[in-house]
Amino acid sequence: MHAIQEEIKQLTSVLNEHNYRYYVDDAPSVPDAEYDRLINRLKQLEAENPELCLPDSPTQRVGGVALAKFNQITHLKPMLSLDNVFSEDEFDAFYKRISDKTSETPTFCCEPKLDGLAVSILYRDGVYERAATRGDGSVGEDITENVRTIRSIPLKLRGSDFPPLLEVRGEVIMPKKAFDSLNDRARAKGEKLFVNPRNAAAGSLRQLDSKITASRALGFYAYALGVVEPESWPLGKGHHEQLMQLKSWGFPVSSEVKLCGDVKTVLDYYADILERREALDYEIDGVVIKVDSIEHQLQLGFVAKAPRWATAFKFPAQEEMTLLEGVDFQVGRTGAVTPVARLKPVFVGGVTVSNATLHNADEIARLGVKVGDTVIVRRAGDVIPQVVAIVAEKRPVSANDILFPQTCPVCDSMVERTEGEAVARCTGGLFCEAQRKEAIKHFASRKALNVDGMGDKVVEQLIDKELVASPADLFRLTASAMTMLDRMGMKSATKLVAAIEDAKQTTFARFLYGLGIREVGEATAANLANYFKNLDKLKSADADEFIKVDDVGAIVAQHLTYFFAQPHNLEVVDNLVQAGVHWPEIEEVAEEALSLKGQTWVLTGTLTKLNRNDAKAQLQALGAKVAGSVSKNTDCLVAGEAAGSKLTKAQDLGVKVLDEDGLLAVLAGE
């Protein structure tokens, strides 16, 4: 029995250490298979010896008996809210108030304002005891069993320098990937979708059945200490130092926390986080700015229900209510018919929005939306604005159903919807003017043939004036014909014709991407080019051959097979080749020459000796995958001049970093 007890103790300790490395350090220390082997062994031992199960065992996060209701908990110390500022002028006023009341220039601790649910977690002698929601600030709901299921929250504190009684405050969030997965599962079951990750986190945390909470992949970030007893316990003299103490005790703390010594640094931090907002793993709605010195915090005190020493600098709102005035139907380059909501203009996400996507007929039905409804519009970063919900109680009696068209609104061809697909498509192909325009815009775009000066308006005029009907027609244009376009003189026309001529020299990958085959993006086009080497092999391939290509699944293989089986598509391809579009032959590369195969690289900053696209292509030619963001799976970051947050994150994760000269050495095989 003693040996079993020791093994359980050892497994619990080892697994908790692995959890810490994974959730707090973001640096997994063992493969998933090894972790699964260890935890399965622990589950087996605990099942056979339940009396030996330890309170901090990672197996105790699966959820327990469902509750009838939530009990109330009175907070040992009120959980206050923060005042907000919405502009630089308002922040300047906050800074002036702080400076006037402190004896020295304050240093601020800045961190992302997480958009989740605030919770209080209590530990006694280093062991998890209870958790509560913020509630009204004085009284919250007892969510002890639900919080226990969150893997990133320690059930037993690390180290030994923690106080006998410790209250930790932080935000429970649902990571974006977990939110997408949750809604995908709900959609597959025909269940109601969550509007945003915050609602999903709140709904998951308030489940009476903690097993449901355990299934929701919630996360947690600590942002403050609450009650500490004894009060004389030695703690950091600054907020940032206290956050680092929390991290040492096993709590996740945002890697974006930063000390800022003056107004400019704070504003730069705000601008940087706002710019990178969409790349973060979690939703945020601003930054929290706190006076770092605990002494100064005590000196400044509180006003009403908020501290004087902190504020939330909010981002422009991402969701607003407005009126749905009508619906138009747009046709894309692949024939997809998309309903677009015409809205009463509303300022959201930093811009005025008057149109938003409704995605497809299924989404219209799911929302239950009608023309005349008051709707909630969301705009996040560069994402196209979308209608995410209706305000049912504001629906007027005159609201009208939205009728999806049976024929194309542009060419009057039949609209068809393939079984199993959400998107309805016009069957007109290049006969459809809308598809023709979008197809040629795509073909001439920067990532395809990169025709310099061939903007959307030029393409639209070329088609409207019947100068171009297919991509190959671009290469037959003359300068005199181009002068028929608005604001196009002979000099500009000659320059554009020269740019079109230059675009004939391309790469096989760019050519394939430019064809606009459904779901064939840049990376897939490059993989297809590297696999087949030439056009004839590609055109004669079947689905079984396509599926052998990296990143090509059954659906993309089906799209490729269908595309090259259509005579009119083959005619488009052949006409382009006959018009003079060509590319260098791709030589067979020996396996041993793919020195970076299986590696993930990221480029950041400005490269001065090498074009970024060339660098990307050369890395891919050596077998590397070139990603857009740094993660624990990144093998190497190339940092050019003025490298920013990606470099910082790579250094935090211990990712190998090369400068441009280092990259050139790798490409040269040194």
Swiss-Prot record:
| Keywords of this entry | DNA damage, DNA repair, DNA replication, Ligase, Magnesium, Manganese, Metal-binding, NAD, Zinc
Q: One GO MF term, please?
A: metal ion binding
- Which residues hold Zn(2+)? C408, C411, C426, C432
> What is any one GO biological process for this UniProt entry?
DNA repair
Which part of the chain is the BRCT domain?
591-670
SMART domains associated with the record:
BRCT (SM00292), LIGANc (SM00532)
- E.C. designation(s): 6.5.1.2
GO cellular component, alphabetical, reads: cytosol
Question: What is this protein for, i.e. what is its function?
Answer: DNA ligase that catalyzes the formation of phosphodiester linkages between 5'-phosphoryl and 3'-hydroxyl groups in double-stranded DNA using NAD as a coenzyme and as the energy source for the reaction. It is essential for DNA replication and repair of damaged DNA.
Q: What is this protein called?
A: DNA ligase
At the highest ranks, the source species' classification is: Bacteria, Pseudomonadati, Pseudomonadota, Gammaproteobacteria, Alteromonadales
